[in-house]
Amino acid sequence: MATPKAALVLMELQNDFLALEGKAYPLLKTVLEENNVVSNLNALIRGARELGMPIIHTPIEFSEDYREMGADPYGILKIVKTLGAFQRGTWGAQIADSIDRHPSDIMIENKSGIDAFCGTRLDQVLRAKGITTIVLAGQLTHLCIESTMRSAYDKGYRVLSVTDATATIGMEQYRMSVEHNWPMFSLPVTHKAFFGQAARG
């Protein structure tokens, strides 16, 4: 794989998901711990940075009144609103304190839905940099990761999804997504396998 044409796209590595005090952390706790997700994410980030890959964060944020969701949210967005999570400008919406950061990291703003391409400049940033391969990691495995994966697939990107650097609301949902859906729209790899591919070119 030609790493100069690849970017690491990180989904929602925010305190409300990854910090012990985060409002949505209890929902992800089992998968985060069982898969050693934060440690694997940081290894992935550091390795990608050493390869010269752009590191792109796509946090999700909402106004204090969650007006972006409309009058009657349902599904996962209703859960987010009920928890009071990811309010713009709060500690919970910030990139998690446990995540390796660098001033060169790119922040994609205005994501208030499931698909990181929808309503953001992600596609423009990737194409401006000549990116043809995206490496996906973060949260939630069967929601934002999978939705963004499908969009990237339709847009013609080569998509690699990192199986041990993602979490969601239970091992059953995690396994169903990674084992059955991810292979339809991406090339699933562990973070170590990804670097093995990169080393081989």
Predicted regions and their residues:
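Short beta-strand segments at enzyme active-site cores
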Residues: 53-60, 65, 162
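Short hydrophobic beta-strand that contains or immediately precedes a catalytic carboxylate
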Residues: 9-11
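Active-site-adjacent betaalpha module
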Residues: 1-7, 16, 43-51, 68, ...
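A short alpha/beta connector and helix-capping loop motif
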Residues: 4-6, 22-48, 52-55
